[in-house]
């Protein structure tokens, strides 16, 4: 067995977690396949030998048969023509009893039911009925992931029909699965459970296995499972799409008694068919650095104020991002390599190269869609910020809290006074102000921007401090995500820690330098979770790019979803555009992915952003479109 140091270093080299100078210190640079095999083997071994910080209490295990769907326990809502079951425990050793359950909602036509004396129904699948374009065998199964900020998603405990028929009337089966979130927690009986990565996705995978175990009892095609979510929910939807059947998750699934085989012992897949992600907060192995490259380097207030050591590390992070990005070997739709040129020019740090030009083109395309999709005169104003309002199936008390670890609400934008722009030129003039950065051609109704920095410094300003996701104050939701059973919030960004160690003398020359911050990062880099798995490996497990950026000719570590839809509000300060853009580019390079839609929406922020229409209708239309082609 190789050392933890080799594992961490190999992962850093593979994902760009360390600068090139650090990577060159390795005895050998492993291939992607080598790293996956070695780290997966480590997870398997560690989970059997080290459970030092587990908070879970041993319970008498349930059995697959005892949690199987009971066909005599269906409920029927005659008014809305919905069959449903709530409180279905989907694993035999649940750690979080209020979360590791699911509810299933089925169009009435898909079932034949007989009413029981207690008011429930004994029902079987009706294979002949059709709703829309689907039958009970071909219907897509859609699963919401309403976990903003990587919060927990409590399983439905009561029946709330509002909004369900929006999906069911199209012939979909709607499954609402609970899952653990970023924090440790306590069950109603007083026992404690561990949260954080990778338990949320582990729970959702167990729910998918449960659906397949009950294939003959629950309507819907188990080959057409789609997840959808926003923000941290969008991230976990993307993870569900990227990590299908990954060996990394095996020990975690086993620990909760997931139904990984059918009644005959045949393996059950946890892979899904499609993933919808709005503004996914993901790629956390690189997100702090990409944030400083795209946004932080153009800010000069608060922690990025001139003369502070935190500004110095911000600039260093922006500088080092080029090596990270170039290591990914991303290509455009024509197969051209996308890279950043290293160094300073008039537009900023590493603000040139084919990747830079591609991103600038994406921003311009978004602006031009806005100009063509909207009619002038156009009135804009108000707030563009919307938290998840809860997907159908949840009661108000079950929706995830919109709180950061310190107990303060996530920041919201101050509404602006509505203003009417008479023409596109009026709108462009308002954006340009006294320092023009957009050129507009009225004849073609198209515009171009001078630089990414000009855009971000005006419309996509940094709204987070240094360590946008691994905060120096441990105040971000992601600090909780990579905590463990002993400590709730912990540092995890090895790249930031490396910079603090190797630039200590330079940083300490600043008057505001605090060496305790450096020490706290260093001390927490080697923490392990309740299965003995190091933080660095859990970060890799919770980064979809880990599983996507594998050459087509190498052995794959997972089964990717066939269909992807990625939308983002271009003005959000929550994450850099690199997050969604790199996800799209990586997926486009994979031959085993059937289609990827990527949309950036001008004038929208951290929302379920859409060019036109609404998120629910567009998601449903997309699922119908891609399944019609299968």
What are these regions (language model features)?
Residues 213-296, 388-390, 395-400, 404-409:
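Primarily recognizes the serine-hydrolase "nucleophile elbow" in alpha/beta-hydrolase
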């Amino acid at each position: 067995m190789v050392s933890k140091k080799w594992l961490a270093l190999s992962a850093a080299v593979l994902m760009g977690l360390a600068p090139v100078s650090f990577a060159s210190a390795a005895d050998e640079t492993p291939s992607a396949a080598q790293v996956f095999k070695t780290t997966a083997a480590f997870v398997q071994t560690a989970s059997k030998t080290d459970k030092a910080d587990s908070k879970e209490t041993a319970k008498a295990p349930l059995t697959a048969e005892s949690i199987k769907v009971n066909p005599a326990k269906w409920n029927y809502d005659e008014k809305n023509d919905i069959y449903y079951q709530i409180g279905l425990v989907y694993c035999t050793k649940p750690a979080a009893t209020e979360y590791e359950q699911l509810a299933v909602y089925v169009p009435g036509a898909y079932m034949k039911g007989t009413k029981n004396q207690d008011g429930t129904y004994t029902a079987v699948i009706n294979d002949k009925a059709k709703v829309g374009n689907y039958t009970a065998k071909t219907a897509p199964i859609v699963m919401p992931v309403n976990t903003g900020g990587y919060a927990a998603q409590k399983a439905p405990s009561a029946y709330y029909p509002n909004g369900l028929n929006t999906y069911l009337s199209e012939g979909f089966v709607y499954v609402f699965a609970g899952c653990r979130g970023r924090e440790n927690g306590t069950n109603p009986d007083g026992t404690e459970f561990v949260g954080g990565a990778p338990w949320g996705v582990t729970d959702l995978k167990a729910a998918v296995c449960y659906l397949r175990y009950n294939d003959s009892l629950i309507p819907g095609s188990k080959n057409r499972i789609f997840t959808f979510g926003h923000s941290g929910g969008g991230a976990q939807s993307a993870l569900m799409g990227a990590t299908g059947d990954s060996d990394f998750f095996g020990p975690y699934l086993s620990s909760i008694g997931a139904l990984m085989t059918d009644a005959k012992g045949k393996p059950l897949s946890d892979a899904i068919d499609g993933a919808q992600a709005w503004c996914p907060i993901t790629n956390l192995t690189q997100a702090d650095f990409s944030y400083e490259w795209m946004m932080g380097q153009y800010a000069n207030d608060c922690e990025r104020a001139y003369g502070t050591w935190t500004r110095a590390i911000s600039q260093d992070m922006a500088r080092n991002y080029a090596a990270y990005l170039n290591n990914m070997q991303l290509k455009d739709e024509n197969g051209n390599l996308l890279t950043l040129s290293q160094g300073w020019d008039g537009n900023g740090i590493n603000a040139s190269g084919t990747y830079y030009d591609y991103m600038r083109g994406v921003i311009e395309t978004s602006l031009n869609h806005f100009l063509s999709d909207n009619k002038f005169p156009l009135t804009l104003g108000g707030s563009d910020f919307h938290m998840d309002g809860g997907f159908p199936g949840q009661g108000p008390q079950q929706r995830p809290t919109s709180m950061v670890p310190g107990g303060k609400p996530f920041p919201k934008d101050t509404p602006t006074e509505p203003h009417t722009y008479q023409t596109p030129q009026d709108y462009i003039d308002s954006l340009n102000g006294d320092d023009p950065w957009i050129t507009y051609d009225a004849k073609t109704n198209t515009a171009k921007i001078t630089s990414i920095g000009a855009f971000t410094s005006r419309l996509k300003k940094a709204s987070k401090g240094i360590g946008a996701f691994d905060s120096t104050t441990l105040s971000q939701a992601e600090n909780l995500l990579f905590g463990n059973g002993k400590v709730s919030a912990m540092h995890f960004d090895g790249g930031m820690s490396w910079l603090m160690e190797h630039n200590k003398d330079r940083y300490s020359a600043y008057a505001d330098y605090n060496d305790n911050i450096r020490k706290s990062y260093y001390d927490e880099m080697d923490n392990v979770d309740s299965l003995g798995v190091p933080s660095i490996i859990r970060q890799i497990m919770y980064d979809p790019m880990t599983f996507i950026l594998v050459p087509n000719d190498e052995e794959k570590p997972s089964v990717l979803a066939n269909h992807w839809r990625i939308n983002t509000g271009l003005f959000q300060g929550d994450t850099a555009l690199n997050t969604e853009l790199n996800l799209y580019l990586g997926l486009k390079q994979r031959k085993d992915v059937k289609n990827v839609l990527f949309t950036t929406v001008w004038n929208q922020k951290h929302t379920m952003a859409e060019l036109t229409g609404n998120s629910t209708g567009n998601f449903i239309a997309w699922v119908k479109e891609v399944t019609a082609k299968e």
